[in-house]
């Protein structure tokens, strides 16, 4: 059978019936003037055999249990300090809303600037992303990052780039950075179209975040960068030689990748050439953040940064590469599980796709972005025709001449479509499939991840081809409610 337009229509009838720049060797330049207020925990810094996050997170019974787990697993790599602070501002665009909360996060390389940093940015750039791209193209070493939530600084009135630069300059001044504002990378997330409250950030919130700098855990950063996120996201891995990799991320809505997605910051104390770090990050992002979708909307602020302090020798580049991917993979799964209104996380495993990995990911995202598929899964309704219909829609548009004679579909490990027809007989099958969905359901207002289960969909085209995994979420009433009330 060939996937012509008529085939796609026939399948629909069946359904009715049933990017980025590079770096080179890490430059570690110790400086004598450091923020005197940085605190340290000798017990946490002394050993490199502390707790890491599990590849698959355990089940948690309470928010406190989850928080404690992340705080311990978030032990910072050598040479990093993190500080956060809260403040308020009044939006020029919506003054009737009154004072609104805003948070700033500062990540500081305590021992000096580094050239060994990599980044992947969205293709549709807001002001902070434009500044970040300029930092990369200019070859500037980094010594700090500053992140604010609540306002994304995208297409604002006034000069958004100048506003971002003024905050960077304030951070550089407070930390006495020899590289000045060019050694600070800005990120913003929040409401699009509002002016960045640069004065409040530069004169109040960011300086207080610097006063709060500590070298213990990255957990505070994971918490402070949240917007509509229900809980913080953090992953970590310690290599056999003691090198540490710790990542934090935020994102709950507008999650659809295009080079990168959401905000993510990965810190390591490894000594690694910047060009190699860039290659590792790009590959890790393609296999993780670029393989997820919550709602199909791309953000204009999306940024993923990996930065190395260079304080520890690296025994194995392959081990670092694997650790970087494991951290990115874990964070990307956490983003979907924490998606706005997510009631189920969908994991689509595509095997032997008759095209590139890029196109296989496109098909997977097309499937998880289908409103009909999302709604069926939200209601624990095993309407398998909607899954087949979404696949038929994609293949009919983009691969109309490809044969699907050997294609099979599974739901929860059970075959539901094979040899050109559905395999659905008896109430027991319906009950089994619905039970699989119900078992993976999340609570409407969970403020911590109670489990790590997925609604499992398998698509095997037979023969040989590309293999990918794509994650997505269902569509719930809560998603509509969150986005209806977002600015307030």
UniProtKB/Swiss-Prot annotation:
Catalytic activity as recorded in UniProt: N(2)-acetyl-L-ornithine + L-glutamate = N-acetyl-L-glutamate + L-ornithine; L-glutamate + acetyl-CoA = N-acetyl-L-glutamate + CoA + H(+)
Protein name: Arginine biosynthesis bifunctional protein ArgJ, mitochondrial
Keywords of this entry: Acyltransferase, Amino-acid biosynthesis, Arginine biosynthesis, Autocatalytic cleavage, Mitochondrion, Multifunctional enzyme, Transferase
Family stated for the protein in its record: Belongs to the ArgJ family.
Coiled coil: none
Role noted for this protein: Catalyzes two activities which are involved in the cyclic version of arginine biosynthesis: the synthesis of acetylglutamate from glutamate and acetyl-CoA, and of ornithine by transacetylation between acetylornithine and glutamate.
Note: This protein may be expected to contain an N-terminal transit peptide but none has been predicted.
Enzyme class at the top of the EC tree: transferase
UniProt site positions, description: Cleavage: 260-261
Recorded metabolic or biological pathway in which this protein acts: Amino-acid biosynthesis; L-arginine biosynthesis; L-ornithine and N-acetyl-L-glutamate from L-glutamate and N(2)-acetyl-L-ornithine (cyclic): step 1/1; Amino-acid biosynthesis; L-arginine biosynthesis; N(2)-acetyl-L-ornithine from L-glutamate: step 1/4
Record site: Involved in the stabilization of negative charge on the oxyanion by the formation of the oxyanion hole: 189-190
UniProt keyword annotation of Flavoprotein present: no
GO biological process assignments: L-arginine biosynthetic process; ornithine biosynthetic process
Complexes and interactors: Heterodimer of an alpha and a beta chain.
Chief place where the protein resides: mitochondrion
Enzyme Commission number(s): 2.3.1.35, 2.3.1.1
Binding site for substrate: 227, 250, 261, 340, 483, 488
Cross-referenced Pfam families: ArgJ (PF01960)
Entries under InterPro entries matching the protein: Arg_biosynth_ArgJ (IPR002813), ArgJ-like_dom_sf (IPR016117), ArgJ_beta_C (IPR042195)
Modification after translation (UniProt): The alpha and beta chains are autoproteolytically processed from a single precursor protein within the mitochondrion.
Origin: domain of life: Eukaryota
Lineage: Eukaryota, Sar, Stramenopiles, Ochrophyta, Bacillariophyta
